[in-house]
């Protein structure tokens, strides 16, 4: 929909012009604009497309982005999404089964990458708001705690950029305790009653403990403690392509990996 005339002209039935730019219908979820490109969800809620101008076609095109990760929306649809501009330009999406999907999108650098996030519960809603150092991602998570299903409003912690493991927060629905005196009993975990939580105390990993009466007890006292639900981070590489002795591809051939070199970025 476009309006003819200058910015100061009034909107009238004669000044409004409707022009179809793509044949792909959109869902009821409002689109997001990233770097001048509009990202919208197709009518069935399973295909994400970008609407951008093509000089070759001399018009707008809407290529499919989910073709890079069709399995993420093959059987489930997107019910809600929100765009987090900083620090990494990510579109966060909630799937109808409670899974959280992220789309890292930086078209100027040709970066389009999907990633999924699983928690001990189900994501139901997501939104972003401005924060002091970056945009904050807030979610509504449905968890079953002590036999009762509850909905929690949770904030995704800022990306860890420190050089000390004492402030590394890598748990779900967790709390941080930072006090002057060491202690071994920490309260305030009523929202995780009966759950087994992971603990990082003064930069060291402690054995998992169970929340009882809203508190946990550590074997040794500590000052800075992070406690919450644990999660596992998995990375799956592409198939190794080592070439062939006779030329061509090595796909389908037997391989034996004898050495692996792992390069880490800003590891502790």
Language-model features: locations:
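Beta-sheet repeat architectures centered on beta-propellers
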Residues: 2, 8-27, 33-37, 42-268
């Amino acid at each position: 929909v476009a309006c003819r005339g200058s910015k100061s002209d009034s909107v009238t039935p004669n000044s409004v012009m409707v022009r179809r730019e793509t044949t792909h219908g959109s869902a009821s979820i409002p689109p997001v604009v990233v770097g001048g490109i509009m990202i919208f969800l197709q009518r069935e809620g399973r295909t994400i497309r970008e609407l951008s101008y093509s000089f070759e076609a001399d018009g707008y095109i809407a290529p499919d982005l989910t073709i890079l990760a069709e399995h993420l929306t093959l059987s489930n649809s997107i019910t809600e999404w929100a765009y987090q501009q900083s620090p990494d330009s990510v579109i966060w999406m909630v799937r109808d089964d409670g899974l959280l999907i992220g789309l890292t999108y930086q078209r100027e650098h040709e970066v389009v990458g999907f990633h999924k996030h699983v928690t001990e519960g189900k994501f139901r809603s997501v939104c972003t708001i401005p924060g002091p150092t970056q945009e904050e991602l807030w979610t509504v998570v449905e968890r079953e705690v002590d036999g009762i299903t509850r909905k929690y409003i949770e904030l995704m912690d800022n990306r860890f950029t420190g050089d000390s493991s004492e402030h590394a927060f890598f748990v779900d629905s967790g709390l941080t305790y930072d006090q002057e005196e060491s202690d071994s009993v920490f309260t305030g975990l009523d929202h995780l009653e009966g759950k087994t939580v992971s603990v990082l105390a003064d930069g060291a990993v402690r054995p998992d403990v169970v929340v009882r009466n809203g508190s946990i007890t550590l074997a040794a006292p500590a000052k800075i403690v992070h406690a919450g639900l644990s999660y596992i981070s998995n990375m799956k590489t592409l198939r190794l392509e080592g070439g062939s002795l006779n030329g061509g591809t090595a796909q389908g051939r037997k391989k034996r990996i004898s050495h692996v070199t792992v390069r880490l970025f800003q590891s502790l």
